[in-house]
Amino acid sequence: MAFPLHSFFKRVLTGTLLLLSNYSWAQELDWLPIPYVYVAKGESLRDLLIDFSANYDATVVVSDKINDKVSGQFEHDNPQDFLQHIASLYNLVWYYDGNVLYIFKNSEVASRLIRLQESEAAELKLALQRSGIWEPRFGWRPDASNRLVYVSGPPRYLELVEQTAAALEQQTQIRSEKTGALAIEIFPLKYASASDRTIHYRDDEVAAPGVATILQRVLSDATIQQVTVDNQRIPQAATRASAQAKVEADPSLNAIIVRDSPERMPMYQRLIHALDKPSARIEVALSIVDINADQLTELGVDWRVGIRTGNNHQVVIKTTGDQSNIASNGALGSLIDARGLDYLLARVNLLENEGSAQVVSRPTLLTQENAQAVIDHHETYYVKVTGKEVAELKGITYGTMLRMTPRVLTQGDKSEISLNLHIEDGNQKPNSSGIDGIPTISRTVVDTVARVGHGQSLIIGGIYRDELSVALSKVPLLGDIPYLGALFRRKSELTRRTVRLFIIEPRIIDEGIAHHLALGNGRDLRTGILAVDEISNQSTTLNKLLGGFQCQPLNKAQEVQKWLSQNNKSSYLTQCKMDKSLGWRVVEGACTPAESWCVSAPKRGVL
């Protein structure tokens, strides 16, 4: 196709000006300055560029995204002019690294954020210029601290910049290590997790940082300035060792690997020791109970007063009641003790047998203190959402989810459990589908923080739910007759109102008395247990084995007595025979102070 001469020069001039405005100071090719002429008739632009480089005995790498068709005649005095012309016509960007010519589409130009720790942006720029990689046509923007550089350009240019930055960082680090010695220490963890833990639930996720991440944040956020005795600043070359600090987690060993100056290693040891502490094991059981509203009196519930428990305590579920009435009647708010919980569950079981109550769900979850745990039982159905031109499936999820973070609060000998609770309970309402067939989802969300004493349970109640059930009855055959069959059909609707209760039962899982007895005489019980045929209280072999293991020195036996006393249990000691000496066996039971080696349980209310 022929173009008018003035139109052709106008297009070339416009493209050249645009190229110079966007990419000034272009690096020239070091190829032979000989003319290049090419006549294309619907040929591939890729083939044209390959033929162009072959004409100068050069190597070219053409992007796969360049698939245009070319028609026309190209005549240029040198390769630089041809390359700029073809780039302006077909939106190309090129980069020459001294050996290979790389050609990409403008859409492939990307950006990178390079983080420098050992060197600065000015040093990186100087290294790029000396190596011949620097290209002023592309973006280069450092931050005020000269530690972050925002670079843009074609992919090959970005790769060379990143490789140069990595080599410069390593070289600078080696130079710094010569001026200041570094040490590497491995700190194994016993209880805490070295690496991060990710908790997934529904469409969300929560990251629980490990010890390595916590230390990295402390190092990255802290600004350390060292001064001498005469209040003079230390030169930066002497403080470079603090910038080389590196903390990594080794999941296979559950250990922390630290690289830093030797004088700072005790600080890491103290921090890691403070973070690596044993956590209490806490079990939380959640009971979701539906009770017929008409049968609340059978349960002993009065929303104006509370629940009558087995030890004559009142449990006020609706905590917005009269506080003076609560105080005068000894009410415990939404907390009940173990005896009151047994009474409540017994009444629920009775009503369940009569069809007036239902235990909807009862999940149990075991976790550690200050560690978030999630139990999620849900269902997902998908709804087709149609737009103007596209349609997609959108998932709707509902079910029972318990998310909690427990914490143990200790005051003297008393322990409480602080629960950060999130309960979500959802279900599909029956007979609630609309015209489009999408059912209605009912959700109940409870988000609270509660403190529960040892042996107590938390009740959250007063949530009413209305259920509508539709039943259709008819006379066989006659009810199916058109029009006339309506006389032989009957449709009945039944509305049932229920009250939903959430019962949360937290408890601390301790190691038990058997653990203390095993530690008392320092003997391992596991080998003997494996030889016992029957594990029961009636097993003679097991009783003989336990009797031998319970015989221990006096100081160890007294430690067990002290532990029993802290748990409100009385005990006394009896003599027994150990391997080479006399020992003492702890007997749990009531005793009088006049008896030998008697430790009575402390009286309630007496500290």
Curated annotation (Swiss-Prot):
Role, per record: Component of the type III secretion system (T3SS), also called injectisome, which is used to inject bacterial effector proteins into eukaryotic host cells. Forms a ring-shaped multimeric structure with an apparent central pore in the outer membrane.
Major localisation: membrane
Any Gene Ontology biological process: protein secretion by the type III secretion system
InterPro entries for the chain: Bact_Secretion_Sys_Channel, NolW-like, NolW-like_sf, T2SS/T3SS_dom, T2SS_GspD_CS, T3S_SPI-1_N0, T3SS_OM_pore_YscC
Gene Ontology terms: cellular component: cell outer membrane; type II protein secretion system complex; type III protein secretion system complex
Annotated signal sequence range: 1-26
Induction info: Thermally induced and down-regulated in the presence of calcium.
Subunit organization: The core secretion machinery of the T3SS is composed of approximately 20 different proteins, including cytoplasmic components, a base, an export apparatus and a needle. This subunit is part of the base, which anchors the injectisome in the bacterial cell envelope. Forms a stable homooligomeric complex. Interacts with the inner membrane ring inner protein YscD/SctD.
A matching Pfam family: T3S_SPI-1_N0
Cellular location(s): Cell outer membrane
Family designation: Belongs to the bacterial secretin family. T3SS SctC subfamily.
Name of the featured protein: Type 3 secretion system secretin
Membrane listed as a keyword: yes
Keyword check for Membrane: yes
Alphabetic keyword roster: Cell outer membrane, Membrane, Plasmid, Protein transport, Signal, Translocation, Transport, Virulence
Superkingdom of the organism of origin: Bacteria
PANTHER family in the record: PROBABLE GENERAL SECRETION PATHWAY PROTEIN D (PTHR30332), SPI-1 TYPE 3 SECRETION SYSTEM SECRETIN (PTHR30332:SF5)
